C-alpha cells in the first residue's frame, strides 16, 4: 500500500511541537544565477516555516569546496543541508558524517549516492530530459549531421546522466546524427566560450551544440550569435529564460528549456521539513502532498530514479520567441 505523507508549512503543526529548522543551502557554485534563483525558493519556504536559512555557495565548482561547506554547516549547528552535488561519490563520507550527527540531507538538481542523503528532488525524469535534448538537437540539425555537447565538469552527476540518455535516444531514434565530442566549460563563462570556439573550429561541419547547463548554454549562444557561425551552428539545452531571451529572439535559432527553478528550491526545503517534523516517508512508493505554496503538482510520488529514491519537480517549459517574455527568472 502507498504511504501518504505531506509537506507542512509552519502553521500546520503546533509551534511547540515543531523542530525549528536551520537550513544550509549548498549549490554547486554560489555565483551561478540558476542556483541563486533556486535559493529564492528556499528562502520563500524558510519564511513560511519560520526557519533560519543561509546560502552557502562555494567559490569553486569542486567536491572539495562543497565538503568544506558541509563540514562548516555541521559545525555551525545546521540541522538541514540542501545540496546540489558536484560529485556523486566524493561528498558521501562528509554527508554520512553529517547524518550521524542528526542532519537531514536533501539533494536537488544533482544527486549523490543514496547513502549520503534522504531523498533527491529531481527536476524531471533524467530519461525525459535526455530524450528532450536529443529531440531538440535533431530538430535543429534537420535529423542528420554532427552535433557536440558542452557540459559543466566531467564529474557532474546530473549532466552525465542526461547526456547518457541523450546519446541512447540519438542512437535509437536518430541514427544519422553523430555526437562528435563532449567538451567541459566548468560552468564558467570564459571557459565555456573557449570550449564553444574550439568545437566550432575543430568540427567545421558542426550543426548543433547541446549545452545542458545554464552557464554553458548562454556562453555558447552568445558566441554563436556574434560570429560567422550564426545561422549555421545552433545552440540548444537548458537555460534560464532571462539569460537566453536575447538569443532566442535575435534570429540565431537558439532554443532553451527549463523547469521552475524558484519552485525547485521551495520544494526541496519543504521536503526536508516534512521528513523532520512529520516523519514523512520518502521511500519509493510514498505519495507526498504538496504544500500550499508549491506552484507545481498537487502531490508527488516518490519514485525510483537513476541513482535512488527521488521526487520529480514537474515538466519543463520550452522557451520560444513567442513565450519567453512571459517568464522572469
Question: Predicted regions: what is each one?
Answer:
Residues 1-22, 96-101:
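Short, low-complexity disordered leader/linker segments with a strong preference
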Residues 34-49, 129-133, 157-177, 191, ...:
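Short, solvent-exposed amphipathic alpha-helices that sit
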Residues 52, 89-128, 139, 146, ...:
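Flexible loop/hinge segments that line or gate small-molecule binding clefts
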Amino acid at each position: 500500500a502507498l504511504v501518504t505523507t505531506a509537506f507542512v508549512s509552519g502553521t500546520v503543526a503546533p509551534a511547540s511541537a515543531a523542530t525549528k529548522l536551520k537550513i544550509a543551502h549548498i549549490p554547486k557554485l554560489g555565483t551561478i544565477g540558476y542556483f541563486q534563483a533556486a535559493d529564492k525558493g528556499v528562502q520563500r519556504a524558510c519564511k513560511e516555516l519560520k526557519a533560519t536559512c543561509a546560502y552557502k555557495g562555494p567559490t569553486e565548482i569542486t567536491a572539495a569546496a562543497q565538503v568544506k561547506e558541509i563540514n562548516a554547516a555541521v559545525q555551525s549547528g545546521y540541522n538541514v543541508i540542501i545540496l546540489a552535488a558536484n560529485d556523486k561519490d566524493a561528498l558521501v563520507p562528509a554527508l554520512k558524517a553529517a547524518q550521524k550527527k542528526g542532519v537531514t540531507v536533501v539533494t536537488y538538481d544533482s544527486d549523490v549516492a543514496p547513502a549520503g542523503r534522504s531523498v533527491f528532488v529531481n527536476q524531471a525524469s533524467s530519461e525525459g530530459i535526455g530524450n528532450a535534448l536529443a529531440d531538440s538537437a535533431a530538430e535543429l540539425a534537420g535529423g542528420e549531421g554532427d552535433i557536440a555537447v558542452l557540459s559543466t565538469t566531467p564529474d557532474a552527476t546530473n549532466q552525465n546522466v542526461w547526456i547518457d540518455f541523450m546519446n541512447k535516444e540519438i542512437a535509437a531514434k536518430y541514427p544519422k546524427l553523430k555526437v562528435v565530442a563532449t567538451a567541459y566549460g566548468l560552468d564558467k563563462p570564459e571557459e565555456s566560450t573557449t570550449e564553444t570556439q574550439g568545437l566550432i573550429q575543430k568540427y567545421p561541419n558542426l550543426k548543433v551544440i547541446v549545452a545542458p547547463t545554464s552557464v554553458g548554454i548562454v556562453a555558447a549562444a552568445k558566441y554563436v550569435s556574434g560570429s560567422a557561425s550564426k545561422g549555421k551552428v545552433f545552440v540548444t539545452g537548458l537555460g534560464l529564460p532571462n539569460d537566453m531571451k536575447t538569443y532566442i529572439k535575435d534570429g540565431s535559432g537558439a532554443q532553451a528549456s527549463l523547469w521552475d527553478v524558484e519552485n525547485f528550491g521551495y520544494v526541496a526545503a519543504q521536503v526536508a521539513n516534512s521528513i523532520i517534523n512529520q516523519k514523512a516517508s520518502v521511500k519509493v512508493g510514498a505519495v507526498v502532498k504538496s504544500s500550499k505554496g508549491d506552484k507545481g503538482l498537487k502531490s508527488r510520488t516518490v519514485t525510483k530514479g537513476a541513482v535512488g529514491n527521488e521526487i520529480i519537480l514537474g515538466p519543463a517549459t520550452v522557451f520560444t520567441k513567442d513565450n519567453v517574455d512571459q517568464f522572469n527568472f
